[in-house]
Amino acid sequence: MNKSFILSTGSYLPRKMLSNNEIASIVETSDEWIRQRTGIVQRHIADEGELTSDLAVNAAKSAIEKAKISVDEIDLIIVATTTPDKTFPSCATIVQSKLKCKNAFAFDVQAACSGFIYAVTVADSLIKSNNRIKYALVIGAEIMSRIVDWEDRSTCVLFGDGAGAVVMKSEMGRSGIISTNLYSDGNVDILCTNGGISSTGDSGKICMNGREVFKHAVDKLTASVEETLKCNNLKITDIDWLIPHQANIRIIEAVVKKLDFPIEKVINTVDKHANTSAASIPLALDYAIQESKIKSGNLVLLISIGAGLTWGSVLLHY
């Protein structure tokens, strides 16, 4: 059976940065308030003319260049996003067009902040079951600044824009992706938008019950790690690096405390990027590799939770 591994990573962050102090000039908040409750210091904001597909393409180009392959060799493109350019066609096919990946098939995955975990799982499954696929391009890309209510200080301080990408390769006998686990529970009301194409005719803005999200995030992310360890006969001490969804430093710290896992082995980019939804995990992964934190042979666990609720994990040897 063919197995998959992550061959390369790439990322893209818009040039414009928005500090906490700048947000404090828009809504009633402060740098201290945001830092203490979220760990966020700044976030990147897409330019007016930038589209989600543009962010995705830039991240993809970086990953493809590092993989040392041509766009013609890519067989599959999956884009995880909640902020596509259009209702249709998919963001993935727009990315395909912009990259000129003529030999790939492409589609989107929508699982909110868990989207990249879902997309990697789907790509891994397709690689294992389809001999046609040698190289898969998986991207998480979001422009969250377009769906936040900039008058709601409980949500507008949390989100940022960006994109991260990986090139996954199929190879007989080699396994980078060890296991994946996906979950959802239909608890849709605690984190959602207040609109949609079939209900209001527009995308709506983000609405969130922060306390409920925090409680569910800590419990479900912890359980996801424990289930992954159990399924693979591992102990928490076997994990070299944990990359959690970069939503809030308090959630990350609470999960790490429950797992009795050293914070020094947790990748944290929430201060730099804020919550970039489906882009969060690939951005953090690329950052950790570029900073020489994650090295070849390391056992890495990716975990995320998002609206739906959806959550899951990917365990991999890098």
Curated annotation (Swiss-Prot):
One of its GO terms (biological process) is fatty acid biosynthetic process. InterPro entries: ACP_syn_III_C, ACP_syn_III_N, FabH, Thiolase-like. Pathway: Lipid metabolism; fatty acid biosynthesis. HAMAP family: FabH (MF_01815). The last Arg residue of the ACP-binding site is essential for the weak association between ACP/AcpP and FabH. Catalyzes the condensation reaction of fatty acid synthesis by the addition to an acyl acceptor of two carbons from malonyl-ACP. Catalyzes the first condensation reaction which initiates fatty acid synthesis and may therefore play a role in governing the total rate of fatty acid production. Possesses both acetoacetyl-ACP synthase and acetyl transacylase activities. Its substrate specificity determines the biosynthesis of branched-chain and/or straight-chain of fatty acids. This is Beta-ketoacyl-[acyl-carrier-protein] synthase III.
